[in-house]
Amino acid sequence: VVLIDLRGHGYSDKPRNIEFYDFADDIKFLLDAIYIDEAAFIGHEMGALIAADMSVRNPGYVSSIILVNPTSIEGELPEERLFRKYAHKIRNWEDDKQEKFLDKRRYYKARKMNKFLKHVVDTNSISTKEEIQAVKDVFKSEGIADVFKHVQVPTLIVAGEHGERTTTLEAKEVADLIQHSEFNVYQHSSAYPFVEEQAQFTQETTNFIHQHAPK
């Protein structure tokens, strides 16, 4: 398993200007460097766009893709849409109170997810505002969601039933854009099905990857 800090994320380089196609190019460069000539890809939320783009631009490298809570809505990030939905009510609240309110709308079980997230390193703390904004800007680019309708590789889409960062409706809209995709809703999940229903996610995704792996 290769877990990648994409350009602008984590401990990777953080240029002030990023183009959407840079992500797939970086992934291909890394795979070549470590002698991986084919792989299955899992992309979460906006990362689903990158997995889709990788499959379209480098089909020979991709045996299948798994998209978790994908969305085809452009121009605004999921977290921004969630805040805007309730801004009339919470915009003047203190930050802690805002977060508690939004957590109840992000997660199926907010306490469980916050416990998990405490163990996730916040690499944004080592990024400047300009570097963080560069990543946000690339995912708000017009036209990037067009990539979904060009996907040809086997595709599994997983959506959490609960939470408002992204919705099952948004995920289903992506599924409708990808011919012959499989669509699964996890009934006890929200933003992170791979954590909230880890055993089911691991089993189903492993089976899907093996089913479409090169013989």
Regions found by a protein language model. Give the residues of each.
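Conserved serine/cysteine hydrolase catalytic core
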Residues: Q133-D176, V185
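Catalytic active-site module of serine/aspartate enzymes centered on a nucleophile-bearing elbow/loop
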Residues: S181-K215
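Conserved catalytic-core motifs of eukaryotic protein kinase domains, centered on the activation segment
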Residues: S12-N17, E76-E79, T168-L169
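Alpha/beta-hydrolase active-site loop signature
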Residues: L6-G10, S72, S190-P193
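Gly/Ala-rich beta-loop-alpha elbow adjacent to hydrolase catalytic centers
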Residues: G43-G47, A51
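Active-site loop/oxyanion-hole signature of alpha/beta-hydrolase fold enzymes
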Residues: V2-I42, Q203
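Conserved alpha/beta-hydrolase catalytic His-Asp/Glu region
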Residues: G75-R81, W93-H150
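Flexible "cap/lid" loop of the alpha/beta hydrolase fold
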Residues: A52-R57, S63-W93
